[in-house]
Design a protein with these regions (language model features):
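Bacterial Sec-dependent N-terminal signal peptides
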Residues: 1-24
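N-terminal, motif-rich segments that launch catalysis or mediate targeting to/interaction with membranes
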Residues: 21-132, 139-229
């Protein structure tokens, strides 16, 4: 299971949608899952099929959002994001006792690596990991607590009122008018060299990549600004 866990830690980095209030939105998360599915090795496919009872990665990619309204799973809500000031670092900033996106991903990986974990636990944490890796590459999930990751920044998207988080979450993706399978089919194929480069990264590396994109957004976006592409 270690190789399977590590696969999910790098494959999401270069997906189409890694440039979401629910994360990437349903279409974005499904597209991410569909793209990841293309790069599965035979062994990984076999292991995932066992855990997901034949369902695809895209099929379960929104699981972590779907359980948000269930009080039984409220403790996992803080795992969808991580916030700290731009002038600080993740390592130096005080950590929330409730956890964050980095804690969530690491926890999921540890469960998948644990040979003593039950299938039920592995299935749950695999579904969560699939979703969280999508969140990790949505810049506003590595944002500012003061405005709730851009949810409180009002902007206009093609002259219609919305907020910055929603634009990145779903508006831009929905504007293409494509299904998640069409988005995945039009994604550039990764070369072996690109995959090797991605594998060298860490969760923290990828988090800071998204953080830089988030910084750029805050430097260029003004409240009530009209956005388009």
């Amino acid at each position: 299971m270690k190789k399977l866990s590590m696969f999910f830690l790098f494959i999401f980095l270069n997906s189409y949608v890694s440039y979401s209030s629910d994360d990437w939105g349903k279409t974005g998360h499904r597209a991410t899952g569909e793209i990841a599915q293309k790069y599965l090795s035979r062994k990984a496919k076999k292991e995932i099929n066992k855990l997901l009872d034949g369902h695809s990665i895209a099929y379960v990619s929104n699981f972590a959002d779907e359980i948000k309204s269930d009080k039984k799973y409220r403790e996992y809500n803080p795992w969808h994001y991580v916030n700290f000031p731009f002038e600080s670092t993740y390592e130096k900033h005080p950590k929330s006792k409730k956890g964050d996106l980095i804690v969530g991903i690491n926890t999921c990986v540890e469960v998948l690596k644990n040979q003593s974990a039950s299938k039920e636990d592995k299935v749950f944490h695999l579904k969560m990991l699939i979703h969280f890796m999508g969140d990790l590459h949505q810049p506003l999930h590595i944002g500012m607590a003061e405005d709730r990751g851009g949810n409180d920044i009002e902007v206009k998207w093609f002259n219609k009122g919305t907020n910055l988080h929603t634009v990145w979450d779903s508006k831009m993706i929905d504007t293409f008018g494509m299904t998640y399978t069409e988005i995945a089919a039009n994604e550039k194929e990764l070369t072996k060299e690109e995959l090797k480069t991605i594998q060298k990264g860490t969760i923290i590396d990828w988090m800071y990549d998204s953080r830089e994109l988030c910084k750029n957004l805050y430097e260029t976006i003004e409240p009530e600004k009209k956005l388009r592409y």
